[in-house]
Amino acid sequence: MSLDTTEKQQLINTHQTHGTDTGSAEVQVAMLSERINRLSGHLQNNIHDFSSRQGLLKMIGRRKRLLNYMRSKSEQRYSETISKLGIRG
C-alpha cells in the first residue's frame, strides 16, 4: 500500500512545479491520491480491515484540506491538479 521510491519519483516528476520541488501541495495531493487508490483496492478485497479503513479516511481528509488550501491560493492550480489526477468528476 505504500509507494516505492521509483513510483514516488515518477509522481514527483509529473506534478512538480520546478526542478527541485518535492513537497508542494500538488505533489502531496498526487501522492495521497495514489495511496488512496491503492488502499481502496485493498479494502474492496478485505472488507473487515477496519484499521486500514480508518487510515483511508484520514488520508482522504488530509487530501481534502490540501485541496481547499490550493483552491484558496490559486483556483487555476487547483483546477489543473484535479483534472490531471481525475478526482472530483
UniProtKB/Swiss-Prot annotation:
Record keywords, A-Z: Ribonucleoprotein, Ribosomal protein, RNA-binding, rRNA-binding
Ranges where the record places region Disordered: 1-25
SUPFAM superfamilies for this protein: S15/NS1 RNA-binding domain
Pfam families in the cross-refs: Ribosomal_S15 (PF00312)
Record's subunit section: Part of the 30S ribosomal subunit. Forms a bridge to the 50S subunit in the 70S ribosome, contacting the 23S rRNA.
Similarity-based family: Belongs to the universal ribosomal protein uS15 family.
Function as written in the Swiss-Prot or TrEMBL entry: One of the primary rRNA binding proteins, it binds directly to 16S rRNA where it helps nucleate assembly of the platform of the 30S subunit by binding and bridging several RNA helices of the 16S rRNA.
The name this protein goes by in its record: Small ribosomal subunit protein uS15
Organism whose genome encodes this protein: Synechococcus sp. (strain CC9902)
